[in-house]
Amino acid sequence: MIVRTQNSESKIKEFFEFCKENEVEFVDFRFSDIKGTWNHIAYSFGALTHGMLKEGIPFDASCFKGWQGIEHSDMILTPDLVRYFIDPFSADVSVVVFCDVYDVYKNQPYEKCPRSIAKKALQHLKDSGLGDVAYFGAENEFFIFDSIKIKDASNSQYYEVDSEEGEWNRDRSFENGVNFGHRPGKQGGYMPVPPTDTMMDIRTEIVKVLNQVGLETFVVHHEVAQAQGEVGVKFGDLVEAADNVQKLKYVVKMVAHLNGKTATFMPKPLYGDNGSGMHTHVSVWKNNENLFSGETYKGLSEFALHFLGGVLRHARGLAAFTNASTNSYKRLIPGYEAPSILTYSANNRSASVRIPYGISKNSARFEFRFPDSSSNPYLAFAAILMAGMDGVKNKIDPGEAMDINLFKLTLDEIREKGIKQMPHTLRRSLEEMLADKQYLKESQVFSEEFIQAYQSLKFNAEVFPWESKPHPFEFITTYSC
């Protein structure tokens, strides 16, 4: 369905000219592993050859969990010369190039390469005739802390994060002897001005750097939790949007680091306060027309509602990709503006799917509110598209919208209404995914080999260790038994 990325002679020439014009000293080839970690290998510009840009760069794939065994470790990084930018943090002039992974044994794009999977999902949409392009836009929330301490030993398990904004510092004597006292408090941080908002200058610096690397931002503000922020960037096609998430996370972490802070996109680092999500806006277009625009509920089309029906039907297994950590499910609980009930509504932030207000047909879209940034964006976006396409093909009814505050529903009321909820654990979401995976495998977008590698990695690296480790809270509840 998809062939190896081959950079044209004109693209290669254009890239070399770009490097010379910008006096580039290093070329930094970057790729994403299964978990979503951004990895890189750099070459001096003087060592760069035409063949490397045409045929790729060899690397050892056995060093990345879930990929190759050491007996078949050779893979190729294929540079994508439509996506590159000057690294604003490098001491020397370095250009970052997005790469796909190519399988030298099967002579095809590597089926465990997340970026290749995202490309296959977009191509599957085109080949199906349902649409030409799927647009995604992510709103990534994050925390910026002053420091963090972590210990993971057989006799001791703990973490400690700190922030000047933290309510726990109300009685603290700082080094200069002054405690200014302006703090947002738990769930009190939505859009206050300084001095309560201590991170304004860091966020504006983040925006400036994002603009430097080609990301157009449209909103920046303090979020609800203490030490929490959000920067929204413009939408793009599925692959571009996932690339943008990787760029955004890199910039946020680096700007915080250079300001003596530490940034995290972890979904739930603070108990008793709001967590961080990755609200994901989606629309599908064909012949330059928004297929989600129509005459049904809130200006949506039948196509859009069927797309939504597919996502809601598959959401419990979809969560294995959109909410990909054990920590994700500590965010998806009532009371912290994180949706756990699988329904939809217009302008209702308690629903797992929101239909935002739009002033034109072009703005018709869904906002999926359950994903978070512990996910690999290439996999999360691809899985959402595959679920939606399944809904369109099979005309899946999403049910009635629920224009009420869903956070106020009791468990009995949820059961009486027959409403599904998100899984409560990563284990459960993985089990749901394994029981409901056929839609992912259409056109081999997600291969069986990849699905098995993914679930094995998640169980062994996250689920099993989490289930086997004593937790500090258990010592409070159980030590004196």
From Swiss-Prot:
Q: Where in the cell is it found?
A: Cytoplasm
Which molecular-function annotation in GO is an example for this chain? ATP binding
One Pfam family name from the record? Gln-synt_C
Name the top EC class: ligase
Q: Where do the GS beta-grasp domain residues begin and end?
A: 22-106
**Catalysis: reaction(s):** L-glutamate + NH4(+) + ATP = L-glutamine + ADP + phosphate + H(+)
Gene Ontology CC entries for this record: cytoplasm; membrane
Keyword field = ATP-binding, Cytoplasm, Ligase, Magnesium, Metal-binding, Nucleotide-binding
GO BP: glutamine biosynthetic process; nitrogen utilization
- Enumerate the residues binding Mg(2+) 2: 141, 223, 230
InterPro entries the UniProt entry points to = Gln_synt_N (IPR008147), Gln_synt_N_sf (IPR036651), Gln_synth/guanido_kin_cat_dom (IPR014746), Gln_synth_cat_dom (IPR008146), Gln_synth_gly_rich_site (IPR027303), Gln_synth_I (IPR004809)
Q: Does the keyword DNA-binding apply?
A: no
Quick one: which residues bind L-glutamate?
274-275, 331, 337, 349, 369
Which cofactors are named for this entry? Mg(2+)
Q: Which family does it belong to?
A: Belongs to the glutamine synthetase family.
- Describe the protein's quaternary organization and the partners it interacts with: Oligomer of 12 subunits arranged in the form of two hexameric ring.
Function statement: Catalyzes the ATP-dependent biosynthesis of glutamine from glutamate and ammonia.
Q: Can you name this protein?
A: Glutamine synthetase
User: What organism does this protein naturally occur in?
Assistant: Helicobacter pylori (strain ATCC 700392 / 26695)
